[in-house]
Amino acid sequence: MTEHVEQLEFQAETHQLLELMIHSVYSNKDTFLRELISNASDALDKLRLESFKDKDLHVDTADLHIELEVDKDNRILTVRDNGIGMSRAEVVDLIGTLAKSGTAELRRKLSEAKSEAAAEELIGQFGIGFYSTFMVADKVTLTTRKAGETGGTRWESSAGSSTYTIEDLAEAPQGTAVSLHLKPADEEDHLYDYTQEWKLREIVKKYSDFIAWPIRMQVERTVTEGEGEDKQEKTIVEEQTLNSRKALWTRPRGEVSDEEYKEFYKHVSHAWDEPLEIIPLKAEGTFEYQALLFLPSQAPFDLFTREHKRGVQLYVKRVFIMDNCEELMPEYLRFVKGVVDAQDLSLNVSREILQQDRQIQMIRKRLVKKVLATVKDLQQAEDQSKYQTFWREFGRVLKEGLLSDFDNRETILQVSSFASTHSDSELTTLAQYVERMPEGQDAIYYMTGESRQQVESSPHMEAFKAKGREVLILTDPVDEMWVGSVPEFDGKRFQSIAKGEVDLESEEEKKASEALREQQDKEFADLLSWLGKTLEENIKEVRLTNRLTTSPACLVGDVFDFTPMLERMYRASGQPVPVSKRILELNPTHPLVTGLRDAYDQRKQDADEGKVPELTETAELLYGTAVLAEGGELKDPARFAHILTDRLTRTL
């Protein structure tokens, strides 16, 4: 008996994805079954966990399992579980639509999806494996009842349709059943006959052998009865379990194939990329646990969103306890996937207890050290390709640990790589930078900015280019944060070339230029004083500098001042920005600066009384160009544009 039947439209992105699945040229269509079995396994895990937590939930957990049912005559394959099930609302949320956080990115990916592996990549990145069923089925029916509820829900859609139906069921077995009305077999299109027992066995063995729950199927086999002349063959049907159910993390690494590890990674991470590195661990003694961790080869699309779920799966004596156990992995390692199986925790442990549990804290410390040691091994390997992939995908995230993990800060610094002026294409480690430092240099020079091009064209770089001094180019938003909190590396302090006074001259050069500096200080003293008063709303000091070679001026901050990029980051996040004025530094050899000095000296009294507006405007232009050159924002861009336009007009 059914009631409350609705026909609903798929979200636009969902329908696009379904079309991609229906017309997919992706050759490995077998993976649809892996996705359905993985979903069923999750549902069984959740039911057992819920039964531990909720004593009012009266469910039978004695025989939790997954069942494959084949109807050869009608070409229907059903994957059934007696797990947690779903409510009507959950069915619509999980199957009828996609997560809103990913729709814009998915729309872009769909428009670019032209390669053979596009379907698999999209499924993995957006966690929507259920849709892979439309690679092999003309129609899909899902029937489900949530544990503890009386009525069920049926969802149904056909290939090519922009709609789906959903209806309430007065009665339904607990759990979820997904029935696929299979397309005709077409081996040229890698579309096999999924009603064949041998094919289903092959897929389960390849992709799902490690699943903890029994995967059962009714199979036909021939038996011989009687003896002698009475001997005869008879076909019987019996239920068989298709998977070995042995947890991979309990097996020695030498006994597990790379293919098994890859499939297990895809199961626990709900991703479709391959693991970059496999990290098995086993600890005995005070705290007994086993772990199997993976470094992914591709960052998920939501790695930097609040919706991203982090943490590894937690088991206790092979009993699933929770997904995304944040207490076992810090935020900056949120990309690490895998399982941890502890021996001495309670089965009904809560997140609140985990936060205070000493054993969990010790396991976490060891896991973090092992992950960082693995990254270090990749970095020091002769073949750098794995490390380069890791750093490209996860370097920005790893550097967040410099702000939060003081115990491992030195290791994080060691395994980090940075762009620098030493090479246009290759990154450098801090150790390599220090090794190249010339004698007498006591600081690691760096500059932050939005892009390499912006940093390299900054006036602050001019003296460093002229002297051949290497500068780290830091363009990730997190760089703005950590460089202010990490004092040094290998005894060398970090020095921003856009903050404080930078002295690149040797003692001999200082002695040789001392007389010239004294002369310049005298010649420019009055101009500097006038500029300081004229621009006092924007700056706190004007001074001469030797850091410029081709630009007339630049702005620098004190050591603890915000950079323009950091100010923008704070404003974008709605945080208050401390009010601070910067220092305007002038190049005493630039024609614009010497010309302004001469013009001021000729009309000093009038200028001091504010009677020479063109000099005031020149001062504003000088300051404005310094702001723009470092990527800053003008307070009154309209006035700056008006003055500049007027000045340019006079030149014609």
From Swiss-Prot:
InterPro entries: HATPase_C_sf (IPR036890), HSP90_C (IPR037196), Hsp90_fam (IPR001404), Hsp90_N (IPR020575), Ribosomal_Su5_D2-typ_SF (IPR020568). It comes from the Bacteria. Residues 352-568 are annotated as: B. GO terms for cellular component: cytoplasm. It holds the Pfam family HSP90. Keywords: ATP-binding, Chaperone, Cytoplasm, Nucleotide-binding, Stress response. It is found in: Cytoplasm. Residues 1-351 are annotated as: A. GO terms for molecular function: ATP binding; ATP hydrolysis activity; ATP-dependent protein folding chaperone; unfolded protein binding. Residues 569-652 are annotated as: C. Its main location: cytoplasm. Belongs to the heat shock protein 90 family. Molecular chaperone. Has ATPase activity. Homodimer. PANTHER family: HEAT SHOCK PROTEIN 90 FAMILY MEMBER. This is Chaperone protein HtpG. It comes from Nocardia farcinica (strain IFM 10152).
